[in-house]
Amino acid sequence: MEIIRLPAFNDNYIFLLVDRATGDCAVVDPGDAKVVLEYLSKEDLTLKTILITHHHADHVGGNRQLLSHFPAAAVYGSEIDLQKRRIPGQTVSLKAGNHLDLFNRTVEILFVPGHTQGHIAYYFPPLQPEDSGDLFCGDTLFANGCGRLLEGTPAQLFASLQQICDLPDNTNIWCAHEYTLKNIKFSLTVDPENEALQRRFQQVQTQRQRQKPTIPTVLALEKQTNPFLRCSDRQLQANLKTTDPLRVFTKLRGKRDLF
């Protein structure tokens, strides 16, 4: 399976999962149908599957147009979003623990509420022990950040991020926005002593100056530099004047909202 990253809007990423042997593909969170259709036409690919992490327009806005070109494509999303009819064209309901088979890969469904109540993520475990898995997590975990609390509670999003932390450290994190540089600038205000974070800031500055994407990130790097995954770190707790990890997380999210 080949993963193609398609930029959309100002800072979104849409991901195509391509089986070159068959010419079939899936798309994750197609907020903009135009960029997807252009790539499919250029590469002569057939869209079979639409995977949605959550219902926001910049993640589902292209569904109807894609289905007009590929009416047989299945649209996957959470059971909560299906109940609320929030995902255009949704045909399949998913919940925590469900599994899919896609291009000879198993896909595990994680329920990761917080940003929205129905948010899910798609985890592709590695085929071989030495390989890396892939997580498509929408707006739950970002490179050096996390999603805003638009429908859920701090405790929900904190628990969702802990789920992600339980995945193997070499997991590739395919999040849906290019927010990395601003996230790192914020992180430095709350975790300035973090040398790994300082190094990452220099690297990401260079990448963005060259208009290079910073996605995917890797879970191990997030555990070293992302304050939202470091709420048990003693230095970060001292900086935020609390030893309660959930309270650290809640303070971080509030500060990031105002940054």
UniProtKB/Swiss-Prot annotation:
Keyword Transcription: no
Domain of life: Bacteria
Catalytic class of the enzyme: hydrolase
Binding site for Zn(2+) 2: D58, H59, D139, H177
Biological-process GO terms, alphabetical: methylglyoxal catabolic process to D-lactate via S-lactoyl-glutathione
GO molecular function terms attached to this record: hydroxyacylglutathione hydrolase activity; metal ion binding
EC code: 3.1.2.6
UniProt keyword terms in alphabetical order: Hydrolase, Metal-binding, Zinc
Assembly and interaction partners: Monomer.
Protein task: Thiolesterase that catalyzes the hydrolysis of S-D-lactoyl-glutathione to form glutathione and D-lactic acid.
Protein name: Hydroxyacylglutathione hydrolase
Gene: gloB
